[in-house]
Each structure stands twice: as C-alpha cells, then as structure tokens.
Regions:
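Short, solvent-exposed amphipathic alpha-helices that sit
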Residues: 1, 74-77, 100-119, 162, ...
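Alpha-helical recognition/docking segments in bacterial nutrient-uptake
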Residues: 1-80, 143-144
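Short beta-strand elements in bilobed, periplasmic/extracellular small-molecule ligand-binding domains
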Residues: 1-7, 110-133
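Short acidic/polar active-site loop segments enriched in Thr and Asp
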Residues: 27, 88-89, 148-150
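Hydrophobic alpha-helical segments within soluble ligand-binding/sensing domains
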Residues: 67-92, 107, 111, 132-141, ...
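Short acidic capping loops at alpha-helix termini that bridge into adjacent secondary structure
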Residues: 88-89, 120-124, 174-179
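Flexible loop/turn connectors
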Residues: 136-228
Length: 228
C-alpha cells in the first residue's frame, strides 16, 4: 500500500510518520523536499529508517539516499537566458535558503551575474519563509524604484504566480515591464495570463527514480546509500 503524507508543517508530517512507524505501516519513506535542520529527515536518520530524499541533502550526505537535479546549474542557465534577452538588472524572488532547492537556484543566479561581470546585490533578492510573510513592501520597493529590475528569476511557479498577480496591482505589465522566469513547469505556469516562462526540472523522472531507489533498498537492505 502506498500512502501520501501531508501536513501544515513539519510537526504534523512528523507526527503522521511516527504513527505509521509505530504501527509498522511503512517499509520506507520518500521526502519530496530537502531543507536545513529538517526534523522529519533527522527523525528518519536517527531511527535508522529507510528514506529517500528528492533534493540535495544538508546533513549526512554520505549516509543518505537522495535524488537531485542540478539546481545551481538550472539557476545559472535561467539567469543566462535573461541576460541573453538583454536584461542587465535581474532580481531574485524565492523561498528561504533553508529550502535547499531555492538556495541552489539562487547560487546559480549569482554565478551567472558574476560570469557576466555583474555584482549580485542583496537588495535585489526578496526571500520569504511562507506566503504569509510580509514580502509585499519589499517587492513594491524593489519594483517601483527608478532603476527597478527589468527581469526577475523566481524559485518556483507558485511564487511566480504570486509575483505576476502583485505586478498587476502595481500596474506593471508582464513581460513588457518585467520579464519573469521560474522553475518546475507545473500546472500553475499554464493558468496565468500570459503563461509563465518556466524551467522544467523533470519532477516525474525524479519521482520515478526516488520510488525505484526505495524499492531497490527495501529488497536489498545492505546496499550502500545512493546519490543520483
């Protein structure tokens, strides 16, 4: 039996996992995210429970099975694309660096700027922990400045939709006043008008590989941790 565990926060997810473990309802777990100081990953690791992480891991990489795409390279290539389109003031909007995929995409964005002789500016980066954070003032200040960015790289499609809606409130036209590039090529990227330009990070293949590795390690428990 396959079970999907969701929760409002780490505590809810951890509680559900602990309940499943107590009732011997799972042979392994797949975490669809990776972040610093994650209590869920720490619990699974400390209890010696089989788990596979989708994303680059923050702790105990040599003892952890994980599947990752190169988010830094994806961030760099996305920023390169905006540079090649003629943009020289490129900003970044993303979730907290605690989420490692966002930290890596931001790092790639900064690498691209440096490669093109542009010094990354921290004031051009707006980051949030959740959508409940007070990010609107920071975005408004950035996007209405006289020398405002002409393009913005966004860590994922959901935030890009939020940004596009916020630009509408400010009277900014996409892409005439601000070009946006995001990541994931999810359903969210196709419900906006205009549709988002988004980088496909192959989530289906990542999920398939994570499931394959989980089954492989269940059937062969003495296998060493795999990094893909």
């Amino acid at each position: 039996m396959n079970t999907v565990i969701t929760g409002q926060d780490d505590a809810e997810v951890l509680d559900a996992i602990q309940s499943m473990v107590a009732n011997a309802q799972a042979d392994g777990f797949i975490l669809l995210y990776s972040k610093k100081d994650c209590p869920v990953a720490a619990y699974l690791r400390n209890e010696g429970l089989l788990h596979v992480i989708v994303g680059k891991v923050a702790q105990s990489a040599n003892q952890t099975i994980y599947i990752d795409n190169d988010n830094a390279l994806a961030g760099e290539e996305a920023a390169d694309y905006l540079y090649e389109m003629g943009h020289r003031r490129i900003a970044y909007f993303g979730v907290s660096n605690a989420m490692l995929f966002s930290a890596e995409r931001k790092r790639g964005y900064q690498m691209s700027l440096l490669k093109h002789g542009i010094t990354p500016r921290e004031e051009d980066c707006v980051e949030v922990n959740t959508l409940n954070d007070a990010y609107e003032e920071a975005l408004k200040s950035l996007l209405t400045a006289p020398d405002h960015p002409t393009a913005m790289l966004v860590s994922d499609d959901i935030l890009a939709v939020v940004l596009e809606q916020f630009c509408g409130k400010l009277g900014l036209r996409i892409p005439k006043d601000l070009s946006i590039v995001s990541f994931n090529n999810s359903l969210f990227s196709r419900i906006t008008s205009p549709q988002l330009t988004t980088v496909d990070v192959n989530p289906y293949q990542l999920g398939m590989e994570a499931a394959s590795q989980t089954i492989n390690h269940i059937e062969n428990p003495n296998l060493l941790a795999t990094k893909i």
